[in-house]
């Protein structure tokens, strides 16, 4: 089992924690991680884009001029794609971009992402993450104490003071342990996680 240091919000070492190898020490599967990221981004797409083909644009039923003798190129409709106001060739239509991964694949992708942070020494465990008031300045001080900039902060429970304090920092995202995903883990350089959140993740994914 990997043994990591535990810090307080002042950046001081206050203990250590053994991580479960079944979650934080698996063989990293980059293919599944990639699939999970693509799946998450695809599922976010609205898929509402739409344009009309020449068959759907109103008007243009009459031939604009006779076939021969005008000096113009022959035309059959003012709604052909080359005309202003005409239809679109291969017009985009609403579609569902989402695709699903099965539960086993999702689980292994999460484990791979967590393991990748441990292997890169980019996982910081906190004994707790509590704030008595909403103060972005204080939250920034915590990040400075931990020497991190771009981070995903994982909490064991929803804490409005922490969440609202971090909200205005563009390089930081907060999440609870039951809402982590591969995209956020790999997007942010460092994974900052509370000790209780580690226990919750190990309980869910073990």
Curated annotation (Swiss-Prot):
Any one Gene Ontology MF annotation carried by this entry is:
rRNA binding
Q: Where is this region: Disordered?
A: 43-86
Q: List this protein's GO terms for biological process.
A: translation
Q: Per the record, where are the segments of Polar residues compositional bias?
A: 43-52
The terms describing its cellular component in GO are:
ribonucleoprotein complex; ribosome
Which keywords belong to this entry? Ribonucleoprotein, Ribosomal protein, RNA-binding, rRNA-binding
Record's InterPro entries?
A: Ribosomal_uL4, Ribosomal_uL4-like, Ribosomal_uL4_dom_sf
Give the family from UniProt. Belongs to the universal ribosomal protein uL4 family.
State the oligomer form and interacting partners.
Answer: Part of the 50S ribosomal subunit.
NCBIfam families on file: rplD_bact
Q: Which purpose does this protein serve, as stated in its record?
A: One of the primary rRNA binding proteins, this protein initially binds near the 5'-end of the 23S rRNA. It is important during the early stages of 50S assembly. It makes multiple contacts with different domains of the 23S rRNA in the assembled 50S subunit and ribosome.
Name-wise, this protein is Large ribosomal subunit protein uL4
The organism encoding this protein is Lachnoclostridium phytofermentans (strain ATCC 700394 / DSM 18823 / ISDg)
Query: What is this organism's lineage?
Result: Bacteria, Bacillati, Bacillota, Clostridia, Lachnospirales
